[in-house]
Amino acid sequence: MAFASASNGAVRFTEEQEALVLKSWAIMKDDSANIGHRFFLKIFEVAPSARHLFSFLRNSDVPLEKNPNLKKHAMAVFVMTCEAAAQLRKTGRVTVRDTTIKRLGSTHFKNGVSDTHFEVARFALLETIKDGIPASMWSPEMKNAWGEAYEHLVAAIKEGMKPVALL
């Protein structure tokens, strides 16, 4: 999916897209722990092999549904994703609380995250949001708004995944 970026590198996220993201995030926010957990369960349903990307899951016998480390991580990632999306238009760029995009990029690079993984996560995120809001709210425009926001976040993470050239 293509996304718009102004010539100065600022993100263009329309007022309508922002309104859709903010409205749906307001509904999901209070249940973000459970919705975030469902997001990751959907990722592992679509791509079971993605478990190896998470050090806290590699040698764990705890079922995904009950794994406290997964629940904690899933909530943090879901909240970060939604908050970054909600601020996209206001800030004109991807902003992330408690960490930096460069660190996220470095972690994703170190763990071998690929374009395919980002696509699986995009699919899982959109399905999770669709299930996390009233059916009457879900629309092609809502899907597009969240998809656009996700693509901006991924682009920022991928920028941080580039190896630093040594001079």
UniProtKB/Swiss-Prot annotation:
Its cofactor is heme b. Induction: Accumulates upon salt (NaCL), drought, cold and asbcisic acid (ABA) treatment. Induced in nutrient deficient conditions (e.g. Ca(2+) deprivation), but down-regulated in resupply conditions. Keywords: Cytoplasm, Heme, Iron, Metal-binding, Nucleus, Oxidoreductase, Oxygen transport, Transport. InterPro entries: Globin (IPR000971), Globin-like_sf (IPR009050), Globin/Proto (IPR012292), Leghaemoglobin-like (IPR001032), Leghaemoglobin_Fe_BS (IPR019824). GO terms for molecular function: heme binding; metal ion binding; oxidoreductase activity; oxygen binding; oxygen carrier activity. A motif (Homodimerization) lies at residues 45-49, 115-127. It is found in: Cytoplasm; Nucleus. Gene3D superfamilies: Globins (1.10.490.10). One of its GO terms (cellular component) is nucleus. Phytoglobin that reduces nitrite to nitric oxide under anoxic conditions (e.g. during flooding or in waterlogged soil). May not function as an oxygen storage or transport protein. Has an unusually high affinity for O(2) through an hexacoordinate heme iron because of a very low dissociation constant. This is Anaerobic nitrite reductase NSHB4. It comes from Oryza sativa subsp. indica (Rice). The lineage of its organism: Eukaryota, Viridiplantae, Streptophyta, Embryophyta, Tracheophyta.
